[in-house]
Amino acid sequence: MASVEAMMENLSWRRTNLRRKINSLSSTSLLPAEILTEIFRLTCQSEDGGLPVTPLFFGGICKDWRETAWSTPLLWNTISLHVSRKAHGSQVQLLRDWLLRANSSPLFIKLTSDDEHESIFCSLRAIMDVLVTRSTYWNSLDSLLPPQCHDILKNNHFPMLTSVSVRPPKGTISTFSEPPNMFLSAPKLLDVDLSGYNFSAMVLPWEQLRRFKTQFLTVAECLKVLKRSPSLKECHLESVYSPEIFPPPMSLDTFYSELEHLDITLIKGAAISLLDSITLPSLTHLRVHYSGAAGFTVSAIHSLVLRSSCNLQRLYIEKQRLDDEDLLPCLESVPSLSHLRLVVVGDSAGLSKKCVSMMHPSRDSGPPLLPKLTWFHYEGPIECDSHSLVDMLSERWCPQPAKNDNTILIASLNTAEIVTHVRYELTDEVECKMRWLTKAGMALSIRSLL
């Protein structure tokens, strides 16, 4: 029996050596270590929607790949853990080994979970206990963060941390939820998402922030964010409300001139008064969303653009209805627009024939609406026949100089997506023209969700 086992062990050893010799003859074995490492790194970073590839995969291929992967810290600088009760023990041990292999590389940390109960919170705390031992190497943190973890973060230093997105458990009421006290220990912090936390309890290095996101603020609190953050480039304010119409200040200045991207979601239509209270000359991207019945007037956007003299390039509006007398003056004030997204959540006053005709390059009364538009998305009621709509889209795909002004250059509309929630008739002629445009290279879609 012993001799048989010895023979089997010898055969296994010979098989391993034979496989290594075969592997040494492959083309990949001739690659320099630097190129192989770069291939590994790019594979780990790929975002194709499938399961992520980790360095552990390469370690299971062969001895040479394992040695390369195990000795390359940059392959281990991304930590993505889906926390569960079953895997808690193995995750903590794997994390310790992972951090050792990451060495001094900047760490990109993401912690998620499908469940939010006490056992998961305990697992998160155990994981955070291990992670803070390398707090000096944190580059970003994206995590569900129960209160049980706050004290762990409090007395640590984060010299490399640039981005933080933390959120309390779903059942937490934001009015009573305080964020962790860690941000003043992060001298390089630029990007903060504190959605779900009480604004008055936020202690942040406001002067250095470039991006900020939160929710459930009054108009007055939104203005405080902008005033405290002169370097802010991008701001996302969700669920903004106003107990009463907030009057604009007597004098408007350009204090917020660094802001380029503003995204606001309103709880009450009166909160649109926020736009009447600011001047943003550097604004290039604006999104305003409100689905309430009362709605808001697009004239607030129109006034902001005129007052700011900004070069707005992307405009996204979502509201109950879009009336021509409200929408068209706003669109006429932003000839610089390249991207437009309009969503009408109601069942009336949507994309009109007048709006479509004003976008046509051959309109009689002057240059077309939005001459630089290259991307157009509309969702809602359509008050224009399909022939007129597709004719306009076709002319914008291959535009000629404006009829009454040859100096105006009209950009090619590369993408157009039109969605309606009711039946919309497309004649055979229209469908034929759409197929031709698609074959020619235009990304065109007109569909009904009915």
Language-model features: where?
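Leucine-rich repeat
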Residues: 1-450
